[in-house]
Amino acid sequence: MFFSLMTPDPAHLRDAAHQQAYGSGAAASDAYADHQWIWNLFPSPAGTPRDFLFRRDVQAGLPRYYVVSQRGPVAQDYAWRVQTQPFAPQLQVGMRLRFDLRANPTVAGVNAQGKHARHDVVSQAKTKLLRERGLALWKDWQGDDKPAQQDMIFKTCSAWLEAQAKRHGFEVDAATLNVDAYTQHRGRKADIQFSSVDFSGELTVLNPELLIAALGLGIGRAKAFGCGLLLVRPVT
């Protein structure tokens, strides 16, 4: 595997912004545009499955991309710096790591047409509570027993992460867990396209092989929208 950091060249910020906005051939507001743009770093025949994960962050007002890939990227544009190094984590049972994860927490369910679908865990929990009270909308719930939005986000998303951790060979230290930036991303027609949440904290390695696989393949869904990349580093 390879780990890459993509940052705009300070001497070419305008060109970098133009390349990011239009290099994918998609609308700059399209959440899928980053994915299409980063594909340019991995030239391959048509039909090749995606073999990279990415995450977009902003520091000092400038975007940066973290990318984990099965192949080394090929820099395509002078306006962006691409720093790449081999990524072969050496993990042991009991090792503690700091982690960051932007994920799309969903559960399986059935949509209004009776077909199988994925549902955002927060929205699913709200729907269940409203149904139990015979209410249609969250704003209709006026009682003192109405849960706080952030409490619901933390409870439902942390439960989702705990289940994912069991599948992927690690255990989250609940005392260090942060659940932030719950966002419902909307598509071009203003409908909700997907949701994301940022997790951070410390974890303990239980199964190195499973965790290494998760570092390369990601956790959860919406990977084409910048979710699923688990970033780890030693606890110092």
Q: Which residue ranges define each predicted feature?
A:
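RNA-interacting cores
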Residues: 1-236
